[in-house]
Amino acid sequence: MKNRWRLGKAITHTLLATTFVYQGGMSVAGAAQVTEITGNASGGAISGNNITYSNTSLFGYKHDDSTAATDGAVTLTNADIFISSGTTGLKGVYGGYSAGGAATGNSVFVTGYKHSSAPFGNSVICGGYAGSGAADGNKITFTNSKSSGVLYGGWAEAGDAKNSVVTITGSTITSNVVGGHTNAGTADNNEVKITDSEISYVVVGGEIFTDGSNASGAATNNKVTLINSSANIVYGGRVGGTWGIATGDTSANGIGDATGNTLTIESLKSGSTINLEQIFGGVVTGQGNANSNKVVLGKTGAGAVTMDKVNTLYGGGSQNGGGVRGGDANGNEIAIRSNVTLRTGTGSSNGTRIYGGYAYAGAANDNEVTISGGHVADMVIGGSSSTGAFGSGTANGNKVRVTGGSSIGGAVYGGFIGMGSASINNIIIEGGTIGGDIYGGYSGYGDAINNSITISGTVDLSNRTIYGGGSVSGNVKTGNTVSFKNTGGSVKAIKNIDVLGVSALANNGNAL
């Protein structure tokens, strides 16, 4: 079985049971075989100091049969490997490798590097590889080093990938970083922790997908934490291929749920800028639900930070892929703290769209976005369902809360849906600046009813219209309420409501 990613700069890697190829490298018939050094005869331990291993792969334990690889370890200090692209064989560093068994408790420790131009070129760094069975409890610790090869805490060909940890500090990775990967199983409770580092491509806590088929499994309870660090795309957990980016195989999708994954991004350095493009708590590309995932940006009490180039942020999302229908995105959360500014950094094109939950062909219910003094360059949507030709869905029970000191560059929607119900959504604006109109719920072709909008504190809506509900064709009034509490100022217009409540105006001389 194999797995291929193709990203914006055409980086491609292929993983076979016997061959790793990265960044343009390829196997050549009759080419030289890499040399393998194993710790099988020394208790599963290998260490290297102040050396570059040329066309050589390192294994704590390596078993070419069904023997499990357990508690193997490779330790490199100011050392690395460099493998020519034309060589064949397993290319990289493995704490433990089992061709037909499980891999448990294996480790790779890397501190510093030796080969300055491209350490770990045409290689993979893998805590534990399981050809059959679970990859469980493996880890990579990568400190003050560089790698042009991908990092996997654990890889399972046909089993669960769980409880693996990748820790990166003060390093540069010009490839991808994955806590746990499986081609057919559950990626559960894996973790990636990155501090003071730069990752050029993708970071994933836990994932399941494979080329050529719709892999069946799940990504649950995985975690990613970035501190003072940059990446291109970040997923807490994912089922299926790369969201919105060609994989090179239209069926590189998944069938299963992405549930309970968490992504935290923060900076402890005041005035710093973190480059990120796409942020996902948990997503499904294929068929399945993305529920109860969470994204937290910023840290209370930390210095101000700009998260630059961000164009997409989902708490949880499910979209179609490979001819199979997506699923629901329910109960996801996004929290943006007061020290965070999100922008795309492209001049007049600035804008970041935020979705608490997004479902291409399913329900987007009970999602929540909270902006506590943060700054967002474009629109905010609590829950969104496209539905379209796939029939009706729901975008119900979603919540958006904006507190004082926040600024939103675009419109605010509690719930948004192409076809179906956008009802029982709740928007609370407690001060701040809103750059567009406010909709409790919006349905292209359906009802937007029983939504509530509450405005309090100091907020200028003189050029904004508040809609209890909006729709091209549907009921947009019944049960919709707008309330003003302890506030003052003006509103351009209020439309499509049943009940208007005004109490305790903060400034009666500037009453609504």
Show where each model-derived region lies.
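Surface-exposed loop/turn motifs in large extracellular/passenger domains
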Residues: 33-92, 97-124, 129-150, 156-176, ...
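Sec-dependent signal peptide cleavage junction
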Residues: 24-34
